């Protein structure tokens, strides 16, 4: 579901995996901007959400996933490696991910190596072309370098 009001857009996704840990948060920060009443909602545990986002990147290689991973890392979130391992064991690759770019050894260290390699090769041009519909130009400038720095810090080789 997408909510829009003036310049603010919020997208809500609903997942039904009942076994995933969650915690309760208030929507007040967003709903105040939209003139809606706040609600208490369950949200996915951040380490699990990071693992799922990393697995999603592995399966589709979208830079918006890289941005989301970077955002979690900047917040100091540590990945749930057990969840990540379970997700990379059975990937559902997009047809857009060439076989040569798929994870060969389905282990967490091999995944980190692949992730580091892909992030190291990113350019500002690629980031801008992919994320220009989502972020203003002022935020795109130098973002590839910020990705590289944060990923290297989180997953040193």
Give the ranges of each region predicted by the language model.
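Structured mid-to-C-terminal alpha-helical surface segments
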Residues: 1-157
């Amino acid at each position: 579901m997408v909510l829009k009001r003036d310049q603010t857009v919020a997208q809500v996704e609903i997942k039904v995996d009942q076994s995933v840990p969650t915690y309760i948060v208030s929507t007040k920060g967003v709903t105040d901007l939209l003139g809606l009443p706040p609600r208490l909602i369950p949200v996915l545990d951040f380490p699990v959400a990071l693992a799922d986002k990393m697995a999603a990147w592995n399966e589709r290689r979208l830079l918006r996933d890289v941005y989301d991973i970077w955002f979690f890392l900047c917040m100091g979130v540590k990945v749930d490696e057990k969840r990540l391992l379970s997700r990379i064991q059975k990937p559902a690759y997009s047809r857009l991910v060439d076989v040569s770019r798929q994870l060969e050894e389905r282990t967490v260290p091999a995944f980190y190596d692949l992730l580091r390699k892909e992030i190291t090769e990113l350019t500002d041009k690629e980031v801008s072309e992919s994320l220009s519909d989502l972020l203003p130009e002022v935020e795109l400038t130098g973002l590839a370098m910020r990705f590289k720095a944060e990923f290297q810090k989180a997953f040193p080789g």
